[in-house]
Amino acid sequence: MPDNFREGDKQDSQKGRQGARWGQERRLEFIDYRLRWDGQINRSSLTDFFGISVPQASLDLSEYTKLAPDNLEYDMSSRVYRSTKLFQPVYMTSSLECYLNDLLQVAIQPEIHFGSFLGWRSPVAAVPRLLRRLDTDVVSQILRAIRENEAVHVIYQSMSDPQGSKRTLTPHSLVHDGYRWHTRAWCHKRGEYRDFLLSRIVQAQNAGPDEERANGDLAWNTFIKIILIAHPGLCLAQRNLIERDYAMIDGEIHLECRQALLHYLLFQLNLTETQSHQAPEALQLALKNKDEIYALLKQ
């Protein structure tokens, strides 16, 4: 089984190679990130992470100062550059979303040295995840079929057929529903596009070109607007709280979702037709255009 390795792992042994691969723009992103989230940076931060020389680190800091002169000031007593009150991030990689995602990766897989720009970090934890078995060779074959517009012969297991049976699929995309990986594919047995769990594909072999079916998934290519509101059964103060939680505009959130993925989204939001009968305090959100959405799910 291949090692679970990402760029940036085992940094102590790869500093020189990172420095060779990553140009100055990447190092400027690093400076921006560390100033935003650590509040400070010095030359050794750059030399340690990228394996570059001290003179090169000085040049990078000088270049960043030209780029955003109001973002940092030099503290002579500590010999570090500190972010100022006027700091405004230059790069999207310094966003709160990116930073929290970096922390989440550390919490989910603490045994892996994640290749992010994290310096000091708060203690962080995440609820354990159940990971499904994935066969590298199977996933590789599915990806090849997607790339080359080909069909694949597979053995697929399901709750109704736990031993597995032969099927021919023409996959066109991968899907993550928030919990599991699927491939979206034309099922030659059923004569329709369906989702197939990658963990339940036991074998996959090339079955030749099938470009026509690889591009004809109407439900995949159709985008549906979902309008979310604070649940009308909540009191005014509670609705205001929910609207602030989700940064609603005029009391609404507008999402676009592929029609083929609607059920997954509603399940995560606790808003399927079955789930929607719970107490308002449990649901918190509601579908403003629920009649339209539930009708689409029945198609």
From Swiss-Prot:
Keywords per UniProt: Antiviral defense, DNA-binding, Repressor, Transcription, Transcription regulation
Disordered, as annotated region: 1-21
Keyword Transcription: yes
Positions of the UniProt region annotated as Probable ligand-binding region: 156-200
Region (WYL domain): 96-207
Annotated GO MF terms: DNA binding
Biased composition (Basic and acidic residues): 1-15
UniProt note: phenotype after gene disruption: Required for CBASS function; cannot be deleted from a plasmid encoding the whole CBASS locus even in the absence of phage challenge.
Location of region: WCX domain: 208-299
Region (Winged HTH domain): 1-95
Any one GO BP annotation for this protein: defense response to virus
Segments forming domain WYL: 131-211
Source taxon at top rank: Bacteria
Pfam families, sorted: WYL (PF13280)
Keyword Hydrolase in annotation: no
Record text on subunit structure and interactions: Homodimer.
Known role: Transcriptional regulator of a CBASS antivirus system. CBASS (cyclic oligonucleotide-based antiphage signaling system) provides immunity against bacteriophage. The CD-NTase protein synthesizes cyclic nucleotides in response to infection; these serve as specific second messenger signals. The signals activate a diverse range of effectors, leading to bacterial cell death and thus abortive phage infection. A type III CBASS system. Binds specifically to and represses expression from the CBASS promoter, found between the genes for divergently transcribed capW and cdnC (cognate DNA).
PANTHER family membership: PROTEIN PAFB, PTHR34580
Protein's name according to its UniProt entry: DNA-binding transcriptional repressor CapW
Source organism per UniProt: Escherichia coli
Gene: capW
